[in-house]
C-alpha cells in the first residue's frame, strides 16, 4: 500500500531553548578528604577559607589542586592539635620565600597526601640540609624524590621518622671500606610505646639508622608493650667501623644494628643486661633473669632481628644485647655449646 499520509506541518515549536548558562561548570578539583580543614594544607577557594593569622589560599589557577591554605614562614610553621590535622613544614616557595605546607601522613591518607598532590622530599627553607617529606602539587614536582617503600611503610605505621642525609664514610684506617646506609632516617621516640634513651643521656633523643632497623624496632615495641616496657636504654646504633681483624663491615657501620643495655617497665622495674643476666638456656634463679632470657628468645623466634648476641656469646657483650639485620642470618646461640669466657683484655676479643 501507500505510505501514511503526511500529517502536514511539523509540530509547533514548544518555545525557545533554555538560555545558555555561559561557561561550563567550574572544575571543583579533586575530592577534598577533609584533612586540615581551615588550616595549612587544607583545601580552599579563597583566603577566607584560611581563617588563621597570615593565612592565604594558593588556588587551583596557580597549580594547587583544590587550593591549599598556607602561611609565610622563616624557619618553623605552627601545628594544630587534632586527628584531622597533619604536621607542617617550612619549605622554599615559588617566590623564593618560606612557605608552610603539610607533611605527608600515611596514617591519615592512603597516598600520604590529598588527591592531586605527591609526597616528595624537600629541604627546610633556612636549612636545606634538613629534609622532610611534604605534600606538593603532582604537576609541579618531578618524580623520583618521594619516599621509598621502607620509609613509606614506616610512616604508615605511625613511626616518628624524618629522612636523614646519606652517609659516605670510611672506617678509620680503612679507605678500602665504605659505610653506606639504606634509606637513612632519624627515628624519634616513642617506638611505638617505649622511649629510647642513650645510656649516658638524661632524656630520649632521635636515633640515626637505616630504615629497615626502624621497622624492626616497631615490631619489637609491640612485644615490649606486652611487659609494660616504657623505656629502652641503648648503647648506640651507627658506628662506621669494620669488625675486629676482618675485612667485613660491622652492621653498626650500616646503621642496621643496635645495642640494648637495659629495659625499664612502667612500674620502675629495671631489667639490666649487665646486672640481671643469667643464661641464654636452662633454668634461671630470678624473675629478671627469666625475663631477659625470654626477650632474647622472643626476638629470635619472631625473627625481629637476624642476629642476637647476649653475654653468653663472649665477654665483650657482658653488658648488652647486640641485635642486627645481617641478611640471610638467624642466630641466637645454641644450647650445649661452650661459650667463650673472659680470659684477657677486651681488646683481645672479636667484636660484632
Annotated model-derived regions:
Residues 1-38:
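Ser/Thr-rich, Pro/Gly/Ala-heavy low-complexity intrinsically disordered linkers and tails
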Residues 29-143:
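Secreted, cysteine-rich disulfide-bonded mini-domains of extracellular proteins
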Residues 65, 86, 96, 115, ...:
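Residues that flank catalytic or metal-binding motifs in active/ligand-binding sites
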Residues 72, 103, 235-241:
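Generic short beta-strand segments
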Residues 90, 161-170, 228-237, 271, ...:
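Surface-exposed patches in mature extracellular/periplasmic domains of secreted proteins
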Residues 145-234:
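Active-site acidic/histidine clusters and adjacent loop/turn architecture
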Residues 150, 176-177, 182-188, 221, ...:
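Catalytic cores and adjacent binding grooves of peptidoglycan-active enzymes
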Residues 208-215, 223-232, 240-244, 249-266:
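Mid-length scaffold segments of soluble, non-membrane domains
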Amino acid at each position: 500500500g501507500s505510505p501514511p499520509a503526511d500529517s502536514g506541518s511539523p509540530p509547533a515549536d514548544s518555545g525557545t531553548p533554555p538560555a545558555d548558562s555561559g561557561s561550563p561548570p567550574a572544575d571543583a578539583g579533586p575530592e577534598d578528604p577533609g584533612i586540615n580543614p581551615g588550616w595549612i594544607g587544607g583545601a580552599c577557594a579563597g583566603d577566607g577559607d584560611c581563617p588563621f593569622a597570615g593565612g592565604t589560599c594558593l588556588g587551583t589557577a596557580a597549580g594547587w589542586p583544590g587550593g591549599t591554605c598556607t602561611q609565610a614562614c622563616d624557619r618553623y610553621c605552627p601545628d594544630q592539635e587534632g586527628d584531622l590535622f597533619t604536621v607542617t613544614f617550612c619549605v622554599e616557595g615559588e617566590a623564593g620565600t618560606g612557605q608552610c605546607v603539610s607533611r605527608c601522613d600515611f596514617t591519615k591518607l592512603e597516598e600520604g597526601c590529598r588527591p592531586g598532590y605527591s609526597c616528595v622530599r624537600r629541604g627546610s627553607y633556612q636549612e636545606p640540609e634538613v629534609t622532610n617529606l611534604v605534600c606538593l602539587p603532582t604537576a609541579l614536582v618531578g618524580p623520583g624524590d618521594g619516599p621509598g617503600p621502607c620509609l613509606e611503610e614506616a610512616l604508615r605505621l605511625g613511626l616518628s621518622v624524618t629522612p636523614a642525609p646519606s652517609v659516605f664514610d670510611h672506617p678509620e684506617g680503612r679507605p678500602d671500606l665504605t659505610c653506606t646506609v639504606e634509606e637513612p632516617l632519624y627515628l624519634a621516640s616513642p617506638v611505638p610505646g617505649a622511649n629510647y634513651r642513650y645510656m649516658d643521656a638524661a632524656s630520649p633523643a632521635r636515633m640515626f639508622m637505616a630504615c629497615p632497623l626502624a621497622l624492626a624496632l616497631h615490631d619489637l615495641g609491640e612485644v615490649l608493650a606486652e611487659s609494660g616496657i616504657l623505656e629502652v636504654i641503648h648503647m648506640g646504633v651507627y658506628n662506621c667501623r669494620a669488625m675486629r681483624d676482618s675485612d667485613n663491615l660491622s652492621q653498626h657501620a650500616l646503621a642496621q644494628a643496635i645495642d640494648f643495655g637495659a629495659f625499664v617497665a612502667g612500674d620502675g622495674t629495671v631489667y639490666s643486661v649487665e646486672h640481671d643476666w643469667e643464661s641464654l638456656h636452662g633454668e634461671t634463679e630470678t624473675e629478671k633473669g627469666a625475663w631477659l632470657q625470654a626477650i632474647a628468645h622472643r626476638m629470635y623466634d619472631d625473627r625481629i632481628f637476624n642476629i642476637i648476641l647476649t653475654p653468653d656469646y663472649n665477654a665483650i657483650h657482658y653488658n648488652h644485647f647486640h641485635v642486627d639485620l645481617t641478611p640471610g642470618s638467624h642466630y641466637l646461640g645454641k644450647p650445649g655449646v661452650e661459650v667463650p669466657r673472659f680470659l684477657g683484655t677486651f681488646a683481645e676479643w672479636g667484636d660484632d
